[in-house]
Structures are given as structure tokens and as C-alpha cells.
Amino acid sequence: MTVQLTDDAYAVLEGRHADPFRYLGPHPEDDRVVVRALLPDATAVEAVGEHGETAILERVHDAGLFAGPLPNGSHRYQLRARFGDTTVDLEDPYRFPPILTEFDLYLLGEGTDQRLYDKLGAHPMVLEGVRGVGFVVLAPNARRVSVVGDFNFWNPRRHQMRVRGNGYWELFIPGATAGDHYKFDMTGPNGETLPQKSDPMAFAAEMRPKTASIVVDQTRLPLPRPAPDNINALGAPMSIYEVHLGSWRRKDGEQWLTYRELAEQLPAYVRDMGFTHVEFLPVSEHPFDGSWGYQPTGLFAPTSRFGTPEDFCALIDACHEHGIGVLLDWVPGHFPDDPHGLGNFDGTALYEHANPLQGRHLDWGTLIYNYGRTEVVNFLVSNALFWLERYRIDGLRVDAVASMLYLDYSRPAGGWIPNKFGGRENIEAIDFLRRFNAEVYAKFPQATTAAEESTAWPQVSRPVEFGGLGFGYKWNMGWMHDTLNYISKDPIHRKYHHGQILFGLHYAFSENFILPLSHDEVVHGKRSILGRMPGDEWQRFANLRAYYAFMFAHPGKKLMFMGSEFGQEREWNHDRSLDWHLLDTPKYAGIQALVRDLNRLYRDLPALHQLDCDPFGFEWIITEDAARNVFAWMRKGNDTRARCLVIVNFSPNVYQDYRVRVPFPGRWREVLNSDAAIYGGSNVGNAGEVRTLEGLVPELSLNIPPLAAIFLKPED
């Protein structure tokens, strides 16, 4: 047959056609149906009808364009192509119907589809009885988008996609399957060839330094069992063990543990230590180990460093089996500018701001999301819901919230653009955070969210409907800075810094606070928590024990970074395992035993957790004894007699016959003493219990151990 090449033909051949279906595939022509196929490197092609009848397709262009009539005019056919000495039967991707429905496009356009992970990305499916993978990607400014991968020898001309409404490109590729590697190859708006891009919605990715996405059949992932009910309730104990999966523990010469190996060890350890939750530093795929996961390129993909998505499910399931809630660090504030990532995705600033005064983070050299774009907000909200639904994560801790809230964050004068009212608040980011929290709590009411927010922004942990940002909790960065500064002082100077302990209680109930001793406090020359303690060896360990006891007695939920629970000496190094051998030495084992018992006490005594975020749960008893570095307070639960008296002595002196007033006469049992010999202390205390003195007002006479805290509860 004689074929006249049209503009559409040349656009397809040159890789600049927005809808190759207009030319490729079956098309009515006069009284017959003509099929056109672009098969680079094929030497001969014929069409095979559904009943086995064949018709030879003519090579009409040396680039591998073939055309000819279909046998019997049927739209159900295959292409039989010869490549050298090999003949292969292929399904023609250009004969299949669209993947996205008009309703899908409507929801995507208005930004109300919070389940983008069901539509975008790569999804194994069956169309017209044929198995393959449907690919969908947003690239509104690209002239051409192709899928390249294992299934087409990475040839960008082989599987050119078609654009649908609002810039969504799609293609069903027959024969592609789970496990295939792929990327998107694009021509930019000015005809330029762009770096091949990983799929923003990929559910798995190659191990760095490789960057291809991997097809995953989400419908076949095992769903982890749910966490215990009400594990995130405000009145429940919450003690979080923060973990970097790559350096918690290693094997065979510092090799990573896999997700499944972690599942065998980590949950049991966390439960034994008494923590209620684990919080993983970001597990989303990231190219640079040294970012600790905080510069992700694959927000929907658990990093392949430790295994597959199925393996990650096994880790979550094991945590839940042991009664441990799982929180993820989540990074919706910025992303790296690696060529395969989101930056300049379709040749334009699709996910980021085009203006570097808005779109580039000066501290980290990363790109900042443009929260003014509906597509970007929808992408991020969908990602949050994805982790909660598909992996049954129990909550998200949002990183670097302060950098999102303020347009001038870490920027010099004149180096930022004010909002429409002339202010420094990032209005679009505020709206995004409120929407994120509203969607999470509406769809997953048992989940929780927490903000790492270091400024005085009000109502971070208040509901959106009451004018807040909507988070469940806020990290108490002020408490962390003040108390670490105080405890690092020599005890003889602490009386001059007494207010650093008192000040935190002035605002302790303005938010639902988490007290964080996080990874950020044991890196970059800050030393480990133990490394900050002053004095000789005995005083250093006693200081640490007293500080941990003070933390667990203080209002607020608790968070401790791995290694701190046994007194890791050196700073954290993401390239090394924790120094578990230290536990062979009694003084480190004593720290670990204390943290285990503090967690147990915190869980078992309602007074220590029921009203963590309520001023009715706390009462100062002694605040003015700066000369002796002593503080005392009462923690309260919902029940009248749910009380716990806490006395903390931040001096190395023993105080005998120390008088403390209490609300109830009778016997008070000493339920924990951080100076106990089993923790490595000097064993000064009150022999396990003390009775109130005779008098009108109930009062205790106590022996206060040095650099220690004691906890007492009334006996019924």
C-alpha cells in the first residue's frame, strides 16, 4: 500500500506528538481499518487477527514505522515483529482504551482526589483481557512524554504517552509487569530533552546510585495488622523511641539489617524497653545517605536500602504484633534538586516555585514546594494518606514546620518575597498544613500527627475548626534547649539558672507537647546526651539518670533517640551501628535499666500520663529552693488519689529530713529512685516508703539522694 506521511506521522517519528493515538494503532480508512506501529529495530512486522489470520505491514519509514490493513478489519489483533533472528508476538498499546475516566480527570483537575496513588504512577491491570501496566504522570508543560524501561530496552520512541485533560499523560503497556524498572523520558516546552525522571508516584525504586522506579502491585501487598486501639489517645502514655533504620544495629562488618531482620529484633527490644511507639527517620526513597532521609525523591516508596515494600510491611506488622505504634518522619517542606527528581520536572517549576527567593532553601540547598498549586497540595496530602492506609502507619511527624510557616525563614533582608498582605507568613503553606491535618483526622481518626516547630507560632496542636494548624502534638523545642542547657552546667552554677527548669511550665499546657531528645541533639558537634553531662565519671552518669527521671516526670509525651537509652558516649554516626558493646559495662546497663523502669512507671501510673497535656495534671510543690537545686511537684491523674510526688535534686549533695507537704496522710511508697544501686547509683533513699509526720498538714520527711530523682505515690 502507498502511505503518505502526514504531520502527525512526523510528529510521532520525531517524538513530539502529544497524542500518538491519533496516528498509531488502528484507524478507519475508506472501507478498511489500517494499523500503524512504530517499532524501532524491527525488520519485519505483520498483524495477526484474533482468529490467526495475518497481514503484512509495510515499512513506510526507516525509523521503524510500519503500516497496513488489519485482517478482517478487527480491532483485536497482535503485532508479530521480527528483531534479527527473533520473532515476537506483541500487543499493540495503541489499540487499548484510555486508563483515566472523565470523572477521574474532573477530580484531578479540581484537586479533590486524595487517592492519587490509585490513579497516578504505575499500576498492573487487565484491559480487554490483556495483562499489563497502566502508567499515568502529571507533566502539563511537556511536549512529549514516553515510558522507558525493561520492557522496551529504554527506547523513548517505543512507548510514547498521550496527554489527557489538565496535563495528565497516560499509556497502558501490555506485557509490562510488577518488578519492571522504568522512568519517564520527556521533551520540554521549548523542545529540549530533559533528564529522564523517576516516577513521583513510584511505589519502589532502585538502590542508589541507580534511580529507576520499579513497578509494584499494591493490591498484592500484605496489609499489616492494626496497632492496639487508642494507642495515640491524648490520655494514653506515649513514649517514642526514635530510630534510624540504617544505624540502629548492623551485621557482618557494618552491613545494614534488612526490614525483615529489623522485624525480628527491633519490636521486641522496643517492647522490652517499655516504649509505646517507634518513630522512624524518613523511610521514603532518598539518593543521599547523609541526608538521613530528609531529602526524599520517592515519597511513596519505602527505601530499597533495606528491602522491598513487602519487607517493610513485615516490619510494621511485627511492631503492631508487639503492641508498638509506628510513626514516620514525613518531609513535605522541601526536596532535593537531583536531576531524576521533582525539580524542573516537565521543563518548568512544576512542584517548586520558579523564583529562587521562594523556591530554594538556603540552608539545605533544596527546593521548596509551591503550596499555591492545587496539584502539589493534592500530591502531598495523598502521600500522607497513602502511608496511613497502605502501610497502616499510626502517625506522621512533620519535619521543619517552621521553615514552611515563614517566608523569611533563614533568609537575609531583601532575600524573600512577602505574602499578598505584606507579611512574612506563608499563607499557602498554612492552608496546606490545615488541610493535611483535617484530611488525616477525618479519614484516620485513630492516627496522630506531630509538628517539629521551633517558633512561638500559636495553636499548632489545636483543631483546624478552632483556628489551629490541626496537629495532634508539637515538639517542645524550648523545653529541650532550656533543660539541656541547665543540665550541662556544673551543679555549683545551676542555682543561677534555676529559671530554665521553671520557665517551661509557664507554657507547658499551651500546646499538646512532646518532649524531644531527638537525633538533632546528638550530631554536629553537640555531643551525645551523656557527653553533655558535667563532672567526674560518677557525676556524669548520675546527672544523666536524674535528667531522664526529670523528663519522664515532666508533663508531656516523651521521645528519645536510639542509643540515648543506654548512654551512648559518642555522637550518632549514620554510617555506624550503635555501640551496643557498652552494655557489657554496668554503668551503661544501669542507664538502660533506669529508662526501662521509667517507661514502665510512666505507663503504669495514670498520674504520669493521663493529664500530660492538661494543667490540672500538674502542681508545683517546691520552686524556690535554688540554693540546693531542688524541685518538687505533684503529677495527677483523673482519679482523686491518682497522684505521684516527684522530687529532683540537681546537686551532688544528700539532703536529710527534707520536708515536703503532701495532700494525703499515711504511707507513701517510693516507686522509683534514680540513685538506686541497680542503676549505678549510691543507693541513698527512703527504704522504699515513708509515712507522713504528725501534724495538721500532711508532710513527709525525706532523704533526698544526690543528683537524683525520687517518685512517691500514696498507698491506698
Swiss-Prot record:
Domain of life (superkingdom): Bacteria
Please give the InterPro entries that the UniProt record associates with this protein.
A-amylase/branching_C, Branching_enzy, GlgB, GlgB_N, GlgB_N_E_set_prok, Glyco_hydro_13_cat_dom, Glyco_hydro_13_N, Glyco_hydro_b
Q: In which pathway does it act?
A: Glycan biosynthesis; glycogen biosynthesis
Cite the active-site annotation.
Answer: D399 (nucleophile), E452 (proton donor)
Q: Which reaction does it catalyse?
A: Transfers a segment of a (1->4)-alpha-D-glucan chain to a primary hydroxy group in a similar glucan chain
The entry lists its GO molecular-function terms as: 1,4-alpha-glucan branching enzyme activity; cation binding; hydrolase activity, hydrolyzing O-glycosyl compounds
CDD domains assigned to the protein according to its UniProt record, in alphabetical order: AmyAc_Glg_BE (cd11322), E_set_GBE_prok_N (cd02855)
Gene3D superfamilies reported for this sequence: Glycosidases, Golgi alpha-mannosidase II, Immunoglobulins
Give the family per the record: Belongs to the glycosyl hydrolase 13 family. GlgB subfamily.
Instruction: Indicate the quaternary assembly.
Output: Monomer.
Q: What does this protein do?
A: Catalyzes the formation of the alpha-1,6-glucosidic linkages in glycogen by scission of a 1,4-alpha-linked oligosaccharide from growing alpha-1,4-glucan chains and the subsequent attachment of the oligosaccharide to the alpha-1,6 position.
- Stated name of the protein: 1,4-alpha-glucan branching enzyme GlgB
Q: What organism, scientifically named, is this protein from?
A: Rhodopseudomonas palustris (strain HaA2)
The gene it comes from is glgB
